[in-house]
């Protein structure tokens, strides 16, 4: 039996094509994945991301606990509502999950992936022992992401308090909604466009989704969410990183807070040793020069360079009208490479792992 978000009946009502996603019955699209993708790049689209796991972390030891279990340092968060992206590492330096943590007036709010929910919760509970901390999973909250160049303006038609806030990127705040209800609205996303991710009581989710539709925000499924994040060069857990992949080879080195040196976070010793020995692989972008489509697990080679790489995520880019991919390759890979696609050797260009941001092509 698949899990469902509170919005599942509404997705079916408006024609959502439902599929199994990490044990959740979620909309893949509502008719055209490409049209939904383009809507987010040019106007505004919305995604039901209520399958994500929200955990509130409270108690006198909340900060020191998160400084221990996260590779990034929550001490960087000094303003309520501010967000931080981090990996949560295991003792071998692999990535248990990637997540966002918000500083709240009462503690911290952590948002982790749905597919890793059980593993993440067990990991956090196990390592909370010895800390004065409480972990509270917020299954009473839904989450809706509104993304695109018109996302903020259209959301403010329903939540007018946003007009006076002018939230910075990676900043959230409680926003007055209907009656005495408040929604937590953060200027974050997973598409490479501006917009909001909104956490709200499950009881308000249906009405809020319909209100967004009424002001012209297009319902979008997980298919478009994946092509958008891939164009933006954003990692997907289980593809670009996992329990056996170091953040140093997953384009996540920037999320590691090495200072102060005395902060002993889980995985520090392992990735410090890896860094000292010299990282052997890197995450790159690939842009296909020939006809075809790049897909995960295809093998990548580069003339004159020993070893081979592998595509971690690949797709046809609706924005660029060509196939793009993220790939883990030996550090010496650069310039032109070759990808094995259906017994053919196709040419691809190695680029930085980001293809489109704010509607503009970067390659």
From Swiss-Prot:
GO MF annotation terms: aminomethyltransferase activity; transaminase activity
Range of residues in the leader sequence: none
InterPro entries: GCS_T, GCS_T_bac, GCST_C, GCV_T_N, GcvT/YgfZ/DmdA, GcvT/YgfZ_C, TrmE/GcvT_dom1
Enzyme class per UniProt: transferase
UniProt superkingdom: Bacteria
Catalytic reaction annotation: N(6)-[(R)-S(8)-aminomethyldihydrolipoyl]-L-lysyl-[protein] + (6S)-5,6,7,8-tetrahydrofolate = N(6)-[(R)-dihydrolipoyl]-L-lysyl-[protein] + (6R)-5,10-methylene-5,6,7,8-tetrahydrofolate + NH4(+)
EC number(s) on file: 2.1.2.10
Keywords, in A-Z order: Aminotransferase, Transferase
BP GO terms, sorted: glycine decarboxylation via glycine cleavage system
GO terms for cellular component: cytosol; glycine cleavage complex
Pfam families with a match to the protein in the record: GCV_T, GCV_T_C
Quaternary structure and partners: The glycine cleavage system is composed of four proteins: P, T, L and H.
Function comment: The glycine cleavage system catalyzes the degradation of glycine.
Family: Belongs to the GcvT family.
Protein name per its UniProtKB record: Aminomethyltransferase
Organism: Saccharophagus degradans (strain 2-40 / ATCC 43961 / DSM 17024)
Lineage: Bacteria, Pseudomonadati, Pseudomonadota, Gammaproteobacteria, Cellvibrionales
């Amino acid at each position: 039996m698949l899990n469902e978000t509170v919005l599942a009946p509404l997705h079916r009502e408006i024609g959502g094509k439902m599929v199994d996603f990490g044990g959740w019955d979620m909309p893949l699209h509502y008719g055209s994945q490409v049209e939904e993708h383009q809507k987010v790049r040019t106007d505004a689209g919305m995604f039901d991301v209520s399958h994500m796991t929200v955990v509130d972390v409270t108690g006198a030891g909340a900060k020191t606990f998160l400084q221990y279990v996260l590779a990034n340092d929550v001490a960087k968060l000094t303003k309520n509502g501010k967000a931080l992206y981090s990996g949560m590492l295991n003792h071998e330096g692999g990535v248990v999950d990637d997540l966002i943590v918000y500083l709240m007036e009462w503690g911290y709010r952590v948002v982790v992936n749905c597919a890793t929910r059980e593993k993440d919760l067990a990991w956090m509970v196990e390592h909370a022992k010895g800390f004065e901390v409480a972990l509270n999973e917020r299954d009473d909250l839904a989450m809706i992401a509104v993304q695109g160049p018109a996302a903020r303006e259209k959301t403010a038609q329903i939540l007018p308090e946003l007009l006076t806030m002018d939230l910075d990127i990676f900043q959230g705040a409680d926003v007055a909604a209907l009656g005495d209800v408040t929604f937590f609205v953060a200027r974050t996303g997973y598409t490479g466009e501006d917009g909001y991710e909104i956490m709200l009581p499950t009881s308000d989710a249906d009405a809020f989704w319909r209100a967004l539709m009424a002001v012209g925000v297009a319902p979008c499924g997980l298919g478009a969410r994946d092509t958008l994040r891939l164009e933006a060069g954003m990692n997907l857990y289980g593809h670009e990183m996992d329990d056996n992949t170091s953040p140093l080879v997953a384009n996540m080195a920037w999320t590691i807070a090495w200072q102060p040196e005395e902060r002993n976070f889980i995985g520090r010793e392992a990735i410090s040793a890896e860094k000292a020995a010299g990282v052997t692989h890197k995450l790159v972008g690939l842009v296909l020069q020939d006809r075809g489509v790049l897909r995960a697990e295809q093998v990548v080679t580069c003339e004159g360079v020993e070893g081979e790489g592998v595509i971690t995520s690949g797709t046809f880019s609706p924005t660029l009208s060509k196939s793009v991919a993220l790939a883990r390759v030996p550090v010496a890979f650069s310039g032109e490479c070759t990808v094995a696609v259906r017994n053919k050797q196709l040419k691809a260009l190695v680029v930085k792992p980001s293809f489109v941001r704010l509607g503009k092509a970067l390659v």
